[in-house]
Amino acid sequence: MGLDSLFMNVNLPQIQAEYDRLRARLAKVGWISHGYVQDRGPGAGGPCYQWTRKVKGKTVSVALSEKQYEALKQAIENWREVQQTLQRMQELSREIIFGTLPNPPRRKRLGKKVLGLN
């Protein structure tokens, strides 16, 4: 399946509308952070919360208060949502760029897999 058949049904207004919705969603995102948090249950000194992430290939863990745990938990969820939103925005961008702008001569037609549209 080549580009001609991939993009015959490119609906520019529909794609632009979805892109605008995704952009608006990004504007509403709160705090973000990578890593993960865990509630390790009660320990000798009370509840134990932990934030773990990779820094320069090394695992780094930090003890948290309950309020820090809750805030970081939300920030990490926001980070994952941002990543998914950006991924979709990239796909839509490539769909428009390769579907509406002229291509150079090619020996083979580009497929969805090559363009990351699957």
Predicted segments — roles?
Residues 1-118:
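A positively charged, amphipathic N-terminal helix/segment that binds anionic biomolecules
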